[in-house]
C-alpha cells in the first residue's frame, strides 16, 4: 500500500502538488479566512490580558453626571469621602500562633 495521497505524486524533478482548482474563488476565500483566523488567534494569545481587561473594566465608567447640578455632585463627593474616612480606623489585626 502506498503512502502517497491523491494530491502529491512523485515526478522526476521531485514532489509536485496537483491542485486542480486552486484558482477557484471559494478556495481563495477559504485560504484568506484561514490566514486571518490564524493571525487573530495569535494576537489574542499574545494580548489576551490587555484585551479582556479592557473589555471588562474599560467599558464601565461609573454613573453619568450629565444634567446633575454642581452642588449635588459636590455633596456626593463629600459623602463618599466621609464614608472612606470613617473606615480608616476599623482594621482588625489577627495574629496566628
Curated annotation (Swiss-Prot):
Virion surface topology ranges: 1-22
Q: Which Pfam families match?
A: Flu_M2
Name the Gene3D superfamilies on file. Answer: 6.10.250.1640
> What GO cellular component term, any one, is given?
virion membrane
Q: Where in the cell is it found?
A: Virion membrane; Host apical cell membrane
Stated membrane topology is: Single-pass type III membrane protein
Query: Where is the region Disordered?
Result: 60-83
Q: How is its activity regulated?
A: The M2 protein from most influenza A strains is inhibited by amantadine and rimantadine, resulting in viral uncoating incapacity. Emergence of amantadine-resistant variants is usually rapid.
Q: Which UniProt keywords apply?
A: Disulfide bond, Host cell membrane, Host membrane, Host-virus interaction, Hydrogen ion transport, Inhibition of host autophagy by virus, Ion channel, Ion transport, Lipoprotein, Membrane, Palmitate, Phosphoprotein, Signal-anchor, Transmembrane, Transmembrane helix, Transport, Viral ion channel, Virion
**Where in the chain is the site Essential for channel activity, possibly by being protonated during channel activation, and by forming the channel gate and the selective filter?**
37
Query: Which InterPro entries does the record associate with it?
Result: Flu_M2
Q: Which residues lie on this side of the membrane: Intravirion?
A: 44-97
**Which positions anchor the lipid (S-palmitoyl cysteine)?**
50
Top-rank taxon of the source lineage equals: Viruses
**GO MF annotations for this entry?**
monoatomic ion channel activity; proton transmembrane transporter activity
Q: What is known of its domains?
A: Cytoplasmic tail plays an important role in virion assembly and morphogenesis.
Q: How does it assemble?
A: Homotetramer; composed of two disulfide-linked dimers held together by non-covalent interactions. May interact with matrix protein 1.
HAMAP family per UniProt: INFV_M2 (MF_04069)
What function does the entry list? Forms a proton-selective ion channel that is necessary for the efficient release of the viral genome during virus entry. After attaching to the cell surface, the virion enters the cell by endocytosis. Acidification of the endosome triggers M2 ion channel activity.
- Record-stated family: Belongs to the influenza viruses matrix protein M2 family.
- Give the protein name, as stated in the record: Matrix protein 2
Provide the species name.
Influenza A virus (strain A/Silky Chicken/Hong Kong/YU100/2002 H5N1 genotype X3)
Q: Which gene encodes it?
A: M
Amino acid at each position: 500500500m502506498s503512502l502517497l495521497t491523491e494530491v502529491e505524486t512523485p515526478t522526476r524533478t521531485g514532489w509536485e502538488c496537483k491542485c486542480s482548482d486552486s484558482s477557484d474563488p471559494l478556495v481563495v476565500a477559504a485560504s484568506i479566512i484561514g490566514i486571518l483566523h490564524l493571525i487573530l488567534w495569535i494576537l489574542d494569545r499574545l494580548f489576551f490580558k490587555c484585551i479582556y481587561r479592557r473589555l471588562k473594566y474599560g467599558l464601565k465608567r461609573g454613573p453619568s453626571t450629565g444634567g446633575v447640578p454642581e452642588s449635588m455632585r459636590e455633596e456626593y463627593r463629600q459623602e463618599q469621602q466621609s464614608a472612606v474616612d470613617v473606615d480608616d480606623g476599623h482594621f482588625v489585626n489577627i495574629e496566628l500562633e
